[in-house]
Design a protein with these regions (language model features):
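Divalent metal-coordination and catalytic microenvironments
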Residues: 21, 71, 97, 116, ...
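Interfacial and helix-entry/exit segments of alpha-helical transmembrane bundles
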Residues: 20-32, 102-117, 187-209, 275-290, ...
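Extramembrane terminal tails and long inter-domain/linker segments of multi-pass membrane proteins
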Residues: 1-22, 50-59, 136-145, 184-188, ...
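Gly/Pro-rich turn-and-neighbor structural signature
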Residues: 32, 112, 179, 186-244, ...
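Membrane-entry segments of alpha-helical transmembrane domains in multi-pass membrane proteins
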Residues: 20-34, 60-84, 102-109, 116, ...
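Membrane-interface interhelical loops and short amphipathic "cap" helices
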Residues: 44-72, 100, 129-157, 216-248, ...
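Transmembrane-helix bundle segments that line or gate the permeation/cavity pathway
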Residues: 38-47, 75-94, 113-136, 160-181, ...
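Hydrophobic alpha-helical segments at protein termini of multi-pass membrane proteins
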Residues: 530-545, 552-562, 566-785
Length: 785
């Protein structure tokens, strides 16, 4: 194979088609660096605009709004979160003794969806009217087509849809990896802090992303199809804020928890002591911080007129949720006390992250007060607060991780003097940029200019100088990275920090075998043999196709057509690879501790897929719940609704629902025949299930045609908007199920579903029964209420 390609082409193929978790981690890393360069440039433009009062003017109001909106989206969603994902992809399998992540192709698919989604988002800068300018939170109705008619908002929405898909796949993948792929001896008690924090992060993503996925879908529907979810007063701002902040507040912890994990690893190594009260810390994060982050999101909505009693409840919960954060800082301090502290670059950034996290946290406690929030919400005090958390704590913590793990990544040491200079300049200029914001209590955070008479000029000038210095100081980090990845300088010993972390026992030059030696935690020293994970083009092809589809919806049919062809080709190729067993997933001859999922001696690959299927369905349930919540919210705020039977053909819909229910019965008969080894009968029932599922879609399509004939369209108020969104989603799920069922039926016809091997059919039945259940719930909720 190597002789068939030139070295350059072979290198390109390797990085486009890799499914190895280490290489995927590096792709995440360098892509996040590319995005932070864009976000940092936008920050520089914003600070330059605010350096002096009017008439100083280098950006128009529109250009400034674009810079602010895209800066926030890029930094939070395309830089900080993916940088944490880079560490998780690379090091979690190493830390738990796994060969790779649970689903290597989906891991690659998740990365390429992230990259393509990010490209779609920033492509608005090249579109007529510019990029999105409704703020990084995309508040409706400002983000609607009425107030933001340019394509920028649509491109952001479409790119976000790809990103939400990426995050969902990534969260399922990493959770399954940690739950079921730990090596023998790697018990929960021995799990490294970074892996614990990764698990908590992915659980947050699994259950928070579906809400904003549904909200973004409704927003795109408003902008492209003419629905009115966020233009009608029954939905509008409050509906969007609920859907956004149910994701947005947990996202804060999604950003900071990987940084905390890296900080904990650094503290252990450079103090020579284990984490103080590690068990209590992990319990507090898992049982307080993670669940409470969903219950306090509405503290971002204190000024929206929500019930006063509800505000007090949220205020109290917010203060309770500070306890794990305080405990984390105390545990890190206690870890350092009495330790043999080595002030290397990783430790300096870790300590800086903890210090600024305290400042950011205390400033945030003020905002949790209903009374103070009314005074501070729209000011630069809030900007200072969240930058101390997102830049100070999260970015500094992740930079500590970079300096700690860089020798592992590259096999090279770096200049400690340059790294320390990077720390000193970053810490000084960071505080110079953001600390003065705490004094700008009267400056609105969404203005692009101001008058000299306000007295804000000196503060803004200092902040701008600090921002320039902070941006320039990051070139020191870039220099260190480029030198290390180019293998310039001194080679690193296998374990330069003398760490006890399991990730340091593997070969840094190996992209296949994580553990060439015996894994130390295994009770009897055994470890399963390694399997080469081949290159696979399907994740890249499908992601590129989806990206072109998104761009084509805005820029023209040619891109749309090319995207559809590429996407269909990629999906077909993925199924063909599976039918011909062309891709091998990493397996395990022995599983480690399996609690809370009982193994029962089941085939490991089947067991792994089963856990992943249940996790995906849990996320999909949250998605459907968010859509149902949207319907309930609208109905509660819009009592004037068409009478039952006045618009919809109830008998037809009831019959169609029964058709889909019947398909579940035929599928169960197919499973029973598969268990008994009756291949011909099984294929017959699978075909019947296909026919019934297809009939459901045809009847649903007829219902849409009938409604359009009555002039009941997407824009027919909230009744039309909710009808087409909910029936469209159920139809999309059925269509996806039929694609999977076609693949399974083909396997059955080929004789690859047998009495001993029918796990794929049984796992598919979980999804199909879930879809049927959702349609059964949809029928009374949409048609009979």
């Amino acid at each position: 194979m190597k002789e068939a390609y030139s070295p350059t082409l072979a290198w390109i193929r390797k990085w486009l088609f890799t499914t190895d978790h280490k290489e995927i981690g590096l792709l995440y890393f360098w892509t996040s660096i590319w995005f932070v360069a864009i976000g940092g440039a936008l920050a520089g433009l914003m600070r330059t605009q605010l350096a002096f009062p009017a008439p100083w003017d280098i950006l128009s109001a529109s250009a400034y709004n674009q810079a602010v909106s895209m800066h926030g989206l890029i930094m939070v969603l395309l830089f900080l979160s993916p940088l944490g994902a880079a560490f998780s992809n690379y090091f979690v399998p190493l830390q738990i003794g796994a060969k790779d992540v649970a689903y290597p192709r989906f891991n690659a698919f998740s990365y390429w969806m992230y990259l393509m989604g990010g490209i779609v988002m920033i492509s608005g800068f090249f579109a007529p009217g510019g990029a999105a300018q409704a703020g990084w939170t995309n508040y409706a109705p400002l983000s609607s087509i009425t107030f933001s008619p340019g394509p920028g908002e649509s491109l952001v929405g479409l790119g976000l849809m790809m990103l939400w898909g990426s995050l969902t796949m990534g969260s399922v993948n990493l959770i399954v990896t940690i739950l079921v792929m730990r090596a023998p001896g790697m018990t929960w008690k021995k799990l490294p802090p970074f892996t614990w924090m990764t698990l908590f992060t992915q659980l947050l993503l699994l259950f928070s992303v579906p809400s904003i996925f549904a909200g973004t879908l409704a927003l795109i529907s408003d902008r492209t199809l003419g629905t009115v979810f966020f233009l009608n007063p029954a939905g509008s701002t409050i509906l969007w804020e609920n859907m956004w902040w149910f994701f947005g507040h947990p996202e804060v912890y999604v950003v900071v928890l990987p940084a905390f994990g890296a900080i904990a690893e650094v503290m252990m190594v450079f103090t020579g002591r284990p984490i103080y009260a590690k068990k209590a810390l992990m319990i507090s994060v898992g049982l307080i911080m993670v669940p409470f982050s969903f219950s306090i999101y509405a503290h971002h909505m204190f000024l929206t007129g929500i019930n006063p009693l509800q505000r007090e409840f949220i205020d109290l919960n917010t203060e309770i949720n500070t306890l794990p954060s305080g405990l984390l800082v105390i545990c890190m301090i206690a870890t350092a006390i009495g330790g043999a502290i080595k002030f290397k670059a990783p430790l300096t950034f870790a300590l800086a992250a903890l210090a600024v996290f305290v400042i950011g946290g205390i400033s945030g406690v003020f905002d949790s007060s209903v009374l103070l929030d009314q005074e501070l919400r729209g000011t630069y005090q809030v900007v200072g607060h969240f930058h101390y958390i997102m830049v100070g704590a999260a970015e500094f913590g992740l930079i500590a991780g970079i300096y700690y793990w860089l020798p592992k990544w590259t096999g090279m040491m770096y200049s400690g003097a340059v790294a320390k200079l990077h720390f000193i300049t970053s810490f000084i200029f960071f505080n110079m940029t953001f600390f003065p914001m705490f004094y700008l209590l009267e400056m609105p955070r969404r203005v692009y200019t101001y008058l000299a008479s306000t007295g804000w000029g000196s503060y803004n000038f200092i902040e701008t100088l600090g921002a320039y210095g902070f941006i320039i100081s990051q070139f020191l980090l870039l220099y260190v990275l480029v030198e290390a990845f180019r293998h310039k300088g001194q080679p690193a010993p296998p374990n330069p920090w003398k760490s006890a972390g399991p990730e340091w026992t593997s070969d840094p030059k190996s992209y296949v075998d994580n553990y060439p030696a015996v894994y130390a935690s295994a009770p009897s020293g055994e470890h399963a043999p390694h399997v080469m994970t081949p290159l696979n083009s399907r994740p890249f092809t499908i992601s590129l196709g989806l990206g072109l589809i998104c761009l084509g919806l805005i820029f023209g049919w040619a891109l749309l057509g090319a995207g559809l062809i590429l996407g269909a080709y990629g999906i077909y190729g993925w199924a063909k690879d599976d039918l011909n067993s062309k891709f091998s997933m990493p397996g395990e001859e022995k599983a480690g501790e399996t609690w809370p999922f009982k193994h029962d001696g089941e085939n490991f690959g089947v067991w792994r897929m089963k856990v992943g299927t249940w996790l995906f369905l849990a996320s999909d349930l949250v998605f459907f719940s968010a859509v149902a919540g949207l319907l309930l919210f609208v109905r509660l705020h819009l009592p004037d609704w068409p009478a039952v039977g006045s618009v919809f053909d109830i008998p037809l819909v009831a019959f169609n629902t029964l058709v889909l229910i019947t398909s579940g019965l035929t599928l169960m008969l197919a499973i029973q025949d598969a268990k008994e080894g009756k291949a011909a009968s099984m294929t017959k029932w699978l075909t019947a299930t296909l026919v019934l599922g297809g009939s459901f879609l045809i009847i649903s399509g007829f219902e849409w045609v009938e409604q359009f004939a009555k002039n009941f369209t997407f824009s027919s108020g909230m009744p039309g908007s909710t009808f087409y969104l909910m029936t469209g989603l159920s139809g999309a799920h059925v269509f996806a199920g039929l694609l999977m069922l076609t693949y399974i039926t083909k396997k059955g016809i080929s004789g690859k579903i047998t009495k001993e091997n029918n796990s794929g059919l049984r796992l598919f039945s979980l999804f199909w029964m879930f879809v049927i259940a959702m349609v059964v719930v949809l029928f009374p909720a949409l048609y009979l209420m």
